[in-house]
Amino acid sequence: MNATHCILALQLFLMAVSGCYCHGTVIESLESLNNYFNSSGIDVEEKSLFLDIWRNWQKDGDMKILQSQIISFYLRLFEVLKDNQAISNNISVIESHLITTFFSNSKAKKDAFMSIAKFEVNNPQVQRQAFNELIRVVHQLLPESSLRKRKRSRC
């Protein structure tokens, strides 16, 4: 995956999420990163990392799921690029904006979110714990009305 594609997708994603209303510094940072990665070329504009999927999911109304995956991707990308002095300030501005808008300005929520992405799925202890918690996760995903029906049918 090309970093140029990532930055362009980020720019479009942020514009879509924020309804094209961003602080001037965020837009300036996005433009600066766009220039740094030369992400406005035809080879970049022809392809989409997220936007085609984004459009399809908007129809279904399950945007929060897709947003969380996209945000996770960008936060990991920022982690890789944070040591690049030429763009570190711009990345910091955009990361702060994402934390403010997606995580309700909670660093604790962001850290918890990122810790999930770092779990090693090949680790047997992680696997055991994950399967131990799976039933609770599945129950929380069920609509509340179907939970009530199940409780009544058991009586």
UniProtKB/Swiss-Prot annotation:
InterPro entries: 4_helix_cytokine-like_core (IPR009079), Interferon_gamma (IPR002069). Disulfide bonds: none annotated. GO terms for biological process: adaptive immune response; antigen processing and presentation; apoptotic process; astrocyte activation; CD8-positive, alpha-beta T cell differentiation involved in immune response; cell surface receptor signaling pathway via JAK-STAT; cellular response to interleukin-18; cellular response to lipopolysaccharide. Its main location: secreted. Keywords: Antiviral defense, Cytokine, Glycoprotein, Growth regulation, Secreted, Signal. Disruption phenotype: Deletion mutant mice show no special developmental defects, and their immune system appear to develop normally. However, they show susceptibility to bacterial or viral infections such as vaccinia virus or Theiler's murine encephalomyelitis virus, despite normal cytotoxic and T-helper cell responses. It comes from the Eukaryota. Pfam families: IFN-gamma. GO terms for molecular function: cytokine activity; type II interferon receptor binding. It is found in: Secreted. Released primarily from activated T lymphocytes. Glycans are attached at N38, N90. One of its GO terms (cellular component) is external side of plasma membrane. Residues 1-22 form the signal peptide. Belongs to the type II (or gamma) interferon family. Homodimer. Interacts with IFNGR1 (via extracellular domain); this interaction promotes IFNGR1 dimerization. PANTHER family: INTERFERON GAMMA (PTHR11419:SF0). Type II interferon produced by immune cells such as T-cells and NK cells that plays crucial roles in antimicrobial, antiviral, and antitumor responses by activating effector immune cells and enhancing antigen presentation. Primarily signals through the JAK-STAT pathway after interaction with its receptor IFNGR1 to affect gene regulation. Upon IFNG binding, IFNGR1 intracellular domain opens out to allow association of downstream signaling components JAK2, JAK1 and STAT1, leading to STAT1 activation, nuclear translocation and transcription of IFNG-regulated genes. This is Interferon gamma. It comes from Mus musculus (Mouse).
